[in-house]
Amino acid sequence: MNKLYIGNLNESVTPADLEKVFAEHKISYSGQFLVKSGYAFVDCPDEHWAMKAIETFSGKVELQGKRLEIEHSVPKKQRSRKIQIRNIPPQLRWEVLDSLLAQYGTVENCEQVNTESETAVVNVTYSNREQTRQAIMKLNGHQLENHALKVSYIPDEQIAQGPENGRRGGFGSRGQPRQGSPVAAGAPAKQQQVDIPLRLLVPTQYVGAIIGKEGATIRNITKQTQSKIDVHRKENAGAAEKAISVHSTPEGCSSACKMILEIMHKEAKDTKTADEVPLKILAHNNFVGRLIGKEGRNLKKVEQDTETKITISSLQDLTLYNPERTITVKGAIENCCRAEQEIMKKVREAYENDVAAMSLQSHLIPGLNLAAVGLFPASSSAVPPPPSSVTGAAPYSSFMQAPEQEMVQVFIPAQAVGAIIGKKGQHIKQLSRFASASIKIAPPETPDSKVRMVIITGPPEAQFKAQGRIYGKLKEENFFGPKEEVKLETHIRVPASAAGRVIGKGGKTVNELQNLTAAEVVVPRDQTPDENDQVIVKIIGHFYASQMAQRKIRDILAQVKQQHQKGQSNQAQARRK
């Protein structure tokens, strides 16, 4: 993706003219400019310089009276399903962008690209070429909060690799290497190890003191704590605060945190710029609910144990560019450092639980990408890579059996129905289209019902997407308090004959299920099976707990079905003999 196409050139433009323009704007390039009639090509050293050239020149710089148009050079064979969208308003919410993208087809992946510009850039993969073509036609130049979007193709690596399934691809061995190699059916996939960093937010005026003369101070911190420290100075130019990422063991992160906090306190005292310098920790929004705990109990305990005052930034501050919440800790240095240890312990636990759930989803739902679902924005360094990039799993192919349709009932607060439906039904339609699921809201059982049933019908991936968005919407619209985690009751139906297998002998299976998933699982006794001879299993918990419980129960049902079919097959063979 480092080769650029330069368009809208006068026919008299020479390579020397382009070399001069690139030199004037200090844009690095490699090789020579290949100039054609009205356009040219050039290679950049890496993706960083390619993006910088696009942001610097495209539609902004004139050459011989014409504005340059620069974008990634993409061969026609690779103009498939992937596009890049630039000039996105930085304050835009993920949901708004998702809704816009979903108007043109099924988004398989949406990941943010790190750039030095103030606006955001995302790479988007649609499910087929026609959807991508429509998106480019409609979105290029589309006005979004006074920003004109710029859209172009980017190379589709899968096309570059050539078709799979034993067929020879046109690119042969020159195709780009795969991110993950295919995994044999049933073979355990090796999970890529990703450590969660400690992310701090520090006042810009103290960054120089933290780095030190010629980097001496930060080198000393790195050496003493055995850590890797990144100071994100170039991001958000002019901002009052800068982010620092510390990569190390939990102990190493805590030691580095203490040293950085001590430097800031000393600098504040010497320069008399502040009476108090609080510790500010950045944590991805997905983990904050579990840090807070039910009715804020976890957070209160940390405050009491460490003698600190802790506040967390509002959900309203989250944007496309900023999926993290700011946790502010006030108190003595020692106490703040103890609080950091407790906070990051909770965050790491939440992260590990989510990784386990993601790993489970990657095996049960091939091709699932959590960035596309919108639960884990891919830009976050605190989020593991999508399972599909680790395992190399491919989406459902034509030779595979289509995923089985499932019906799930999710119970939401009655007052949240309007938010889920949206104005003139717009939100529920977009949600249904995004998840590729049927979503209906059942009438209230009584006029004063406090909950309403949402009926979702679709395959496993559709269930994951739809339920995830519903959980997210309820939190976003403040139907649950800022210190309260979203926990919903979900019903799935199982054959009455298999209910015993879900419960297990003496309740062993259901107890193991609850311990494993952290969800409450109830199979009500004395149920009368419905007309399809099915009974209800109730699941209560936060999103990942509920999803994991649903998948485990489906797994049990699949085993029961397989054993039943095997028994029937054996009986048939015995009769033939």
From Swiss-Prot:
Task: Report any Pfam family annotated for this entry.
Answer: KH_1
Give the PROSITE patterns listed for this entry.
KH_TYPE_1, RRM
Q: In the record, which positions carry Phosphoserine?
A: S12, S73, S181
Q: Which residues carry this modification: Phosphothreonine?
A: T528
Give the UniProt subcellular location, in the record's own words: Nucleus; Cytoplasm; Cytoplasm, Perinuclear region; Cytoplasm, P-body
Which SUPFAM superfamilies does this chain map to? Answer: Eukaryotic type KH-domain (KH-domain type I), RNA-binding domain, RBD
Q: Name one GO biological process term.
A: nervous system development
Q: Which residues form the KH domain?
A: 195-260, 276-343, 405-470, 487-553
For the region Disordered, what residue ranges are annotated?
160-190
Where are the residues of the annotated region Sufficient for nuclear export? 310-324, 485-495
Give the top-rank taxon of the lineage listed in the UniProt record for this protein.
Answer: Eukaryota
Signals that turn on the gene: May be up-regulated in response to CTNNB1/beta-catenin activation.
Annotated Gene Ontology cellular component terms: CRD-mediated mRNA stability complex; cytoplasm; cytoplasmic stress granule; cytosol; dendritic spine; filopodium; growth cone; lamellipodium
Presence of the UniProt keyword RNA-binding in the record: yes
Q: Where in the body, by tissue, does this protein show up? A: Mainly expressed in the embryo, including in fetal liver, fetal lung, fetal kidney, fetal thymus (at protein level). Also expressed follicles of ovary, as well as in gonocytes of testis, spermatogonia, semen, oocytes and placenta (at protein level). Expressed in various cancers, including testis and lung cancers (at protein level), as well as kidney, prostate and trachea cancers.
- Tell me the ranges covered by the RRM domain, including all copies: 2-75, 81-156
What keywords is this UniProt entry annotated with?
Cell projection, Cytoplasm, mRNA transport, Nucleus, Phosphoprotein, Repeat, RNA-binding, Synapse, Translation regulation, Transport
State if Phosphoprotein is listed as a keyword: yes
After translation, the protein is modified as follows: Phosphorylated at Ser-181 by mTORC2 cotranslationally, promoting binding to the 3'-UTR of IGF2 mRNA.
Entry text on domains: Domains KH3 and KH4 are the major RNA-binding modules, although KH1 and KH2 may also contribute. KH1 and KH2, and possibly KH3 and KH4, promote the formation of higher ordered protein-RNA complexes, which may be essential for IGF2BP1 cytoplasmic retention. KH domains are required for RNA-dependent homo- and heterooligomerization and for localization to stress granules. KH3 and KH4 mediate association with the cytoskeleton. Two nuclear export signals (NES) have been identified in KH2 and KH4 domains, respectively. Only KH2 NES is XPO1-dependent.
Instruction: State how it assembles.
Output: Can form homodimers and heterodimers with IGF2BP1 and IGF2BP3. Component of the coding region determinant (CRD)-mediated complex, composed of DHX9, HNRNPU, IGF2BP1, SYNCRIP and YBX1. During HCV infection, identified in a HCV IRES-mediated translation complex, at least composed of EIF3C, IGF2BP1, RPS3 and HCV RNA-replicon. Interacts (via the KH domains) with HIV-1 GAG (via the second zinc finger motif of NC). Associates (via the RRM domains and KH domains) with HIV-1 particles.
So what family is this one in?
Belongs to the RRM IMP/VICKZ family.
Q: What does this protein do?
A: RNA-binding factor that recruits target transcripts to cytoplasmic protein-RNA complexes (mRNPs). This transcript 'caging' into mRNPs allows mRNA transport and transient storage. It also modulates the rate and location at which target transcripts encounter the translational apparatus and shields them from endonuclease attacks or microRNA-mediated degradation. Preferentially binds to N6-methyladenosine (m6A)-containing mRNAs and increases their stability. Plays a direct role in the transport and translation of transcripts required for axonal regeneration in adult sensory neurons.
The entry's protein name is: Insulin-like growth factor 2 mRNA-binding protein 1
Organism from which the protein derives: Homo sapiens
